[in-house]
A protein has these predicted regions:
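Solvent-exposed adhesion/ligand-recognition segments of exported proteins
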Residues: 27-28, 183
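Sec-dependent N-terminal signal peptides
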Residues: 5-14
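Sequence-structural signature of mature extracellular/luminal beta-sheet repeat domains
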Residues: 21-23, 74-77, 156-160, 184
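The right-handed parallel beta-helix/beta-solenoid scaffold, focusing on the short coil/turn
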Residues: 27, 34-36, 42, 47, ...
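N-terminal signal peptide c-region/cleavage motif recognized by signal peptidases
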Residues: 15-20
């Protein structure tokens, strides 16, 4: 029997065993988990946690990531979340951080590493990003809450378009700075 056939049979016999489990978060969450869901209007704090999957913030939900927290996947708030605040001194995001339609102040503070991209699109809440390493692109498009970008390292591009007001800041290093990010 080949390995593929063995895995197929195992998957058929134990369908839930190979799938990541979702943990609902409303309050403080520590320890190891697969995917984490922040339900509508819930306030979740990940503190010294290790996630094998991603974090999903639902409409009106709020997420704070503190301490030595590692998220293997993405942090996604694209359904009108309240905010995402990453305040730990050693937070690692293995994928992307995506925020869309958030309406409160969002912040990513020094000591944070985002291996993928930071995408901040059509938000009415302000964004503060200071002393962050981003392994791919930083993209800010069509935001109305303002953004301050200070002393960040972006491996690829800083792209800022159609933000009112335009982002402010200085000391950022990027492969290429485009449009409203050019002077930052």
């Amino acid at each position: 029997m080949t390995i593929k056939k063995s895995l197929l049979i195992l998957t058929m016999l134990v369908p839930g065993a190979l799938m990541a489990e979702d943990t609902q978060c409303n309050g403080v969450l520590k320890g190891s988990h697969d995917n984490v869901i922040v339900p509508e209007s819930a306030v979740c704090t990940l503190q010294n946690a290790r996630l094998n999957g991603s974090v999903y913030v639902k409409r009106g939900g709020a997420l704070t990531i503190q301490g030595r927290t590692y998220v293997n996947g993405n942090v996604i708030s694209e359904d009108g979340g309240r905010y995402v605040r990453i305040t730990g001194t050693n937070v690692r995001i293995g994928g992307n951080v995506q925020m869309k339609y958030n309406y409160d102040t969002n912040a990513i503070q020094p000591g944070t590493t985002i291996q993928g991209s930071l995408q901040y699109v059509e938000n009415t809440g302000a964004l503060f990003v200071t002393g962050v390493f981003i392994g791919s692109d930083l993209q800010l498009f069509k935001n109305s809450g303002g953004a301050t970008l200070m002393n960040n390292t972006i491996r690829q591009n800083m792209q800022c378009k159609e933000n009112t007001p335009a982002p402010s800041g200085s000391g950022n290093v990027a492969g290429d700075k485009e449009d409203q990010c050019r002077a930052l």
